[in-house]
């Protein structure tokens, strides 16, 4: 399995300047047939300008689940995090969701 992959971006999320997306390869275990890094980056870019309430937090990170996020007519869930005092979004998982 590949290690985490890093991509430069210019986004503002939760009023924070974000300059990097770090994608964990976890999604490839079950979702490689429907999700890839390109799709994940497109989903992350849809967060730009948004304010999101965290689902959980610890001493180091805030954790988020955002769904549905639409891309190319399909619905996805994005599981991501922000590290306090850091300028990146970490993507923990991403996968297709059925439309409701």
Give the positions of each predicted feature.
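Ribonuclease/tRNase effector modules and their secretory precursors
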Residues: 1-100
């Amino acid at each position: 399995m590949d290690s985490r992959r890093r991509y430069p971006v210019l986004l503002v999320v939760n009023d924070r300047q974000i300059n990097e997306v770090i994608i964990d390869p976890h999604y490839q275990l079950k979702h490689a047939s429907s999700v890839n890094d390109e799709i994940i980056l497109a989903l992350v870019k849809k967060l730009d300008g948004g304010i999101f309430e965290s689902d959980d937090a610890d001493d180091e990170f805030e954790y988020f689940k955002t769904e549905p996020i639409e891309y190319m007519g399909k619905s996805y869930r994005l599981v991501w995090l922000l590290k306090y005092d850091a300028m990146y979004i970490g993507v923990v998982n991403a996968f297709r969701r059925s439309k409701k």
